Amino acid sequence: MSCNKEKDILGNWKLANGQGTLNIEKLGETYKCTWSIEEEDHHHEYLGIGIFVNNKLFVSRYSKKVPMAGVGMYKPIGDFRSNSALWASTQNFDTLGSGIAIRQETNEGFEGDYKVRYFIKEYESPIFDLKIIKKKQNDNLYDLTWSIHNKVQLHGVGIIHNKQMFLAYGGIDFQYEVVILSNVNESELNSKGALITNSSINDEIYIR
């Protein structure tokens, strides 16, 4: 992790097309993003929770009306049956959690059925059944669902970057977007985002 790169991404930004602003601040071990977007006759406000990995900020973006959202990363370990997890949620906004996802199959892809458990501070989650499915229209995007006793509790969208999966997730009644923010230089920020209900990646440029 580069402290300079991390510092460069913080602060106030504006969309290059002039239709919105973005503020990024660090809160403990995570990052809070606030968007204000103007679209035709509508004003939209979004929030985001992010983790900084390899000089990039990976964010879960969601409407201000959403009660809970999370951001995560899966990284293959061992014999490809297991993925380690790094995650954060708005329920513990300033703290990173860990986890482990295990499946029976051995392959280098992320698709499959997993048993997964998460840890944060003194809390252990119940064991979830995690299903990861590649989106048909885009080999780089994935749909994720977390179930307990065959009932889906959470859903999410994942994107592959540097052989790791970064994801945005939350309750099944709400929309989430996984966003990758990276500095082009000190005054330009590149954004790539994918909505949970979409199969395309949207590009945006922020400046200051």
What are these regions (language model features)?
Residues S2-R208:
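Central antiparallel beta-sheet cores of small beta-barrel/beta-sandwich binding domains
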